[in-house]
Regions:
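An N-terminal assembly and electron-transfer interface module characteristic of large anaerobic redox
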Residues: 1-413
Length: 413
């Protein structure tokens, strides 16, 4: 018998604030601005103390994957802070729709709310029709604006990591990021983002103006399960740690994951020999998104001071060489392909973020590292485990050992 749950209604759009967990700080600031433009009051959660983990441990089974524990813990810690009226908030959580346990976070969250907050509605953000809320509709104009937010977020994240390790004047890179975030958020909250070409130029010019030292630091790629790869809360501020350690972080963009999800439906039709509405729509969607990502790459190519992102078709070629595009559980072949592309393009040092309980990630990331090293013998891949009992000291010590090994290489002495 299915338990009834509170739905987010049309009337709640006027009275409720939607709380959103923080996974990608840059991207999600733009996404919340877009949602505000379409009449949704949203707030991006910033709480990140140990209490987040403790709440997750108290309310989620300890055998559940670490990202679920953190997301649900962040929600409950925020609700218990006294900052929010439980009768005037809703919670938003994503569902991938795949075999990964992330598709069940929604039900785990509702279970955690039953005792103290049964009146709080939970909104599922999904693109596969898993669940719908009467008061939250993903219209085509909204979806297009969300795609724009992802593209701009990817660009700002990439440029930030290419500038921050080398800035002459401390704080210039953060100022460029804050200025571009504010400018784009204002556009999103107004009539919309407007011209992509002009916005790309706005972002690129802002970061190109950051004075940088004329030196080259070792690049360290970051791959792994999507939440732990991107979330500073989950990975203990991994990018900041690498920058402090004298490295340049290289983080694949979120659009790669979006393209991966779109092309998987196309791959299913090719592998299993069928065509239907889903494969045709996914093929058109993939081509459209790929064209947008390539236009972004061309905009970056005009600035010789920056490196552009890898073309997604190159990632697919790496997947065909190293694994198989039929492996799509969780982040599937994408993680293996990202490791291959990073190594192929000179980012030989790679941190693989491994959250507890993420079985697909252990197979397609840690389990495939040997295959990547066979293809690229100079690749230095280090898997870092993240779970409630893992101390940041242990994680940082493993990273420090990796950095020490990098410095021992002749080219970095």
């Amino acid at each position: 018998m299915e338990t009834k749950h509170v739905q987010f209604t049309e009337e709640m759009r006027k009275t409720h604030t939607i709380l959103i967990p923080d996974m990608l700080p840059i991207h999600f600031k733009l996404i919340t601005a877009v949602l505000g433009r379409y009449g949704y009051k949203t707030e991006l959660l910033q709480n990140s103390a140990r209490a987040v983990v403790d709440e997750g441990l108290k309310n989620v089974h300890n055998d559940t994957c670490y990202p679920a524990l953190l997301v649900i813990g962040q929600f409950l810690d925020a609700l218990k802070s006294g900052k929010y009226d439980p009768d005037k908030v809703a919670l938003m959580i994503s569902q991938t729709g795949g075999g990964c346990r992330a598709s069940n976070y929604l039900h785990l969250l509702r279970k955690a709310l039953e005792a103290e907050y049964p009146q709080i509605p939970v909104i599922s953000l999904n693109f596969s029709g898993l669940e719908k809320s009467p008061g939250f509709k993903l219209t085509l104009p909204l979806l297009l604006k969300l795609v724009d937010a992802v593209l701009y977020g990817d660009l700002m994240m990439m440029l930030y990591n290419q500038c921050k390790p080398y800035e002459v004047n401390e704080g210039d890179t953060d100022a460029a990021l804050a200025a571009t975030e504010l400018a784009l958020a204002k556009k999103a909250a107004g009539r919309g983002f407007g011209s992509k070409r002009k916005n790309y130029k706005l972002i690129l010019d802002a970061f190109a103006a950051v004075r940088r030292k004329n030196q080259e630091k070792p690049r360290v790629g970051i791959v792994g399960e999507i939440y732990v790869k991107y979330s500073p809360l989950a990975n203990n501020h991994l990018e900041e740690f690498l920058i402090r350690g004298g490295c340049e972080p290289v983080v694949p963009g979120l659009m790669d994951f979006v393209l991966y999800c779109a092309v998987n439906n196309v791959n299913d039709g090719r592998i299993y020999g069928f065509k239907n509405t889903m494969t045709r729509v996914s093929s058109l969607l993939y081509k459209y998104l790929l064209s947008l990502n390539r236009k972004l790459g061309k905009a970056v190519d005009k600035y010789v001071c920056f490196r552009s992102m890898d073309d997604f078709e190159e990632l697919r070629k790496e997947a065909d060489k190293l694994i198989n595009q039929g492996v799509k559980m969780g982040e599937g072949w994408l993680i293996t392909a990202e490791m291959g592309c990073l190594a192929k393009t000179g980012t030989l040092n790679i941190v693989c973020t491994q959250p507890f309980g993420c079985l697909p990630n252990h197979i397609v990331a840690k389990g495939m590292s040997r295959r990547v090293k066979d293809e690229y013998p100079d690749a230095n891949i280090v898997a870092i485990d993240y779970d409630p009992s893992a101390t940041s000291v242990n994680q940082e010590n493993r990273l420090k050992l990796m950095l020490a090994n990098i410095r021992e290489k002749p080219e970095h002495k």
